Structure formats: structure tokens, C-alpha cells
Design a protein with these regions (language model features):
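Conserved catalytic motifs of ABC-family nucleotide-binding domains
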Residues: 159
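Conserved ABC ATPase "signature" region
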Residues: 105, 109, 114-134
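Short, charged/small-residue-rich alpha-helical element at the C-terminal edge
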Residues: 232-314
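Catalytic Walker B motif of ABC-type/P-loop ATPase nucleotide-binding domains
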Residues: 163-166
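Hydrophobic anchor residue at the start of the ABC signature
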Residues: 152
């Protein structure tokens, strides 16, 4: 879904940072997120993703730089940001002793939605997210997937222009994950921008744009296709029955950046673009010397997981 014609970006951050004592949790982050876009925010634990979300929501004051969210300054216009954004935390943050309906009505009141407007919005969202039959159940008794759905409904009660979702499908089974994503696409089609953190790389492929955080820095961003393109012609697949021995041998081949195991297939990463047919001989020689002869050698299309692992490996090596 493309942005509304002439619409300003929903997030504009320039040099944003947050320091806790001697720790730079987020450093010099500059970012734009377009209207009506699903933006995937990736990175390992401790990379600064949640800290970034809290700053953009106005929940945590930056110690450097500045940002505007839906047109409002994050340091001085918290109330305006709250009225136009929703936030769903990574952990279940609703009231377990209240029913599903009571939780929704409570958050509706927090956002200034009362009476018939709240009832109408609840009917609308509960039908879409399949919570209708659970209205009277205590929230603490819901399954993980249903808790996530209720949290999402509460974040949407006031029809926000932008919603921050911190790991919205964590701990949810694949079928429930698919339902959540179907709903997120429908939200985006209806005009809501989404800022999503996730550890699931297949989910990142569903986003219109993604950014990768490492050690508090945004080190790459773009469309999933453009991000994968950074590894184009640099990933080669190898069949190996003795996968562990072959992996160790291939890591010593000049030009090889890393090797990972996927069953009887090895994914061989090169520092520069290569032709699989050209490098096959050097790979076979190294593996045969180690007593782990190879089967087929073939080019592989890179994935976001490949890129994620490459960035993480470089970050670890740089420390």
C-alpha cells in the first residue's frame, strides 16, 4: 500500500540517542517511516529496539537528537502523540483479573472513548480479531495468541494513525501468527501505519521496509528486496553428508566469510560476489582433504536471515 499523496512521513528522527549512565542504548539514529507503511524493526536482544520505540512514543526522553511522530515533537508534545498513536508492549500488560471486555473499556476510557463510541469500536474490533465469544473471560486465562489479540485491540481503540507493536507474535503458534498478519495488512490498507519489531525473519519479509539495529545503531534499512540484494551472488549452497567436518574445512577457503549448516546443506557466504561454478573446485578440494566430500554446489538466493546473521557476525567480530 502506497502512502497517501502528499502525506508527511509518520516518523522523522534525526540523530536520536538515549544514554543510560555510560551506556549508549541508542546512538545517532536517523529514520523516516512513510504513511500507510509496515516498517519492520530488526536486531538482536539489547540492540536498542524497545528503547527506540519508547522514545518515539514519548515514554522516554531522548538524550540526543530529535524526532517528530505524526507531526509532533517527542520531547514536548507527548499528549498529542498519545492521541494519534497506539502502543502494544512485548509482554502482556493488561489486567489479568479483568475480563476481556473490561480491559477494552478501561483502555477506551484512557484514550477518551466512552459510551456508544466505545461499544461500537469494541464490536468492530472484536469481530475482526475474533474475540467476540471471549468477552466475559478473564484476560489472564487467555492463550498467548488471544492475549496478543486483546492487546492489539486495546492499542487500536482510538483509531490511531500509527501503531507501535513490540514483538506482536512472540510466543504465538504459526496459525495465530498468520491471522495477526492478515489483520495487520487490513489495518495498513485502511490507512494505519505500523512500526513492528520481530525476531521472525519470515515476518520481516512481509514488511514494506525494514531497518536493522545493532549495538544501538541503525546500520541498514530499505525494502526487503533491496536488503537481500546486498548479498546477491555471495551465497552458495553445498550438499554435504558430513556437514560438520565440511563446514570446518570450508571456513578456511580464501574468500569465504562464513559457513552455516541447514541439515545436509551448507550455506557458504563469500566476502564478495562469486560464481558458484567457479568456486566449486576450491570448495571440493578443501572438503575432500578433510575427508568430507561434497555433493552438488549451486547458487542460492539470499534471505533476510542470511543478512541478519551476516550483520550480527560482523558486529560480534568488531567488539
Amino acid at each position: 500500500m502506497s502512502a497517501r499523496e502528499g502525506a508527511a512521513p509518520v516518523v522523522v528522527a534525526e540523530g536520536l540517542g538515549r544514554r543510560f549512565g555510560q551506556l549508549d542504548a541508542v546512538r545517532d539514529l536517523s529514520l523516516e517511516i512513510e504513511d500507510r507503511q509496515i516498517f519492520g524493526f530488526l536486531g538482536p536482544n539489547g540492540a536498542g529496539k524497545t528503547t527506540t520505540i519508547k522514545m518515539l512514543c514519548g515514554l522516554l526522553r531522548p538524550t540526543g537528537g530529535h524526532a517528530r511522530v505524526v507531526g509532533f515533537d517527542v520531547t514536548s508534545q507527548h499528549a498529542q502523540i498519545k492521541r494519534h498513536t497506539g502502543y502494544m508492549a512485548q509482554t502482556f500488560s493488561l489486567y489479568p483479573d479483568l475480563t476481556v471486555e473490561e480491559n477494552f473499556r478501561f483502555f477506551a476510557g484512557v484514550y477518551g472513548v466512552y459510551g456508544r463510541a466505545a461499544a461500537h469500536r469494541m464490536d468492530e474490533l472484536f469481530a475482526q480479531i475474533e474475540l467476540d465469544e471471549l468477552r466475559g473471560l478473564q484476560a489472564g486465562r487467555l492463550s498467548g495468541g488471544m492475549k496478543q489479540r486483546l492487546g492489539l485491540a486495546c492499542a487500536l481503540v482510538h483509531r490511531p494513525r500509527l501503531v507501535f507493536l513490540d514483538e506482536p507474535t512472540a510466543g504465538v503458534d504459526p496459525a495465530q501468527r498468520q491471522r495477526v498478519w492478515n489483520f495487520l495488512y487490513a489495518l495498513c490498507d485502511a490507512g494505519t501505519a505500523l512500526f513492528v519489531t520481530t525476531h521472525y525473519l519470515d515476518e520481516a519479509e512481509r514488511c514494506h521496509a525494514v531497518g536493522f539495529m545493532l549495538d544501538g545503531r541503525l546500520i541498514a534499512r530499505g525494502t526487503p528486496a533491496s536488503m537481500r540484494g546486498q548479498l546477491q551472488d555471495r551465497v552458495v549452497g553445498v550438499e554435504a553428508r558430513q556437514a560438520v567436518d565440511a563446514m570446518r574445512a570450508l571456513r578456511g577457503v580464501p574468500g569465504v566469510d562464513d559457513v552455516t549448516i541447514h541439515g545436509h546443506e551448507l550455506r557458504v557466504f563469500f566476502a564478495r560476489p562469486v560464481d558458484a561454478g567457479t568456486v566449486a573446485e576450491s570448495l571440493r578440494v578443501a572438503a575432500t582433504r578433510a575427508g568430507a566430500p561434497l555433493g552438488r554446489v549451486y547458487p542460492l538466493a539470499p534471505t533476510l536471515e542470511d543478512l541478519f546473521m551476516t550483520y550480527s557476525r560482523r558486529g560480534t567480530a568488531a567488539r
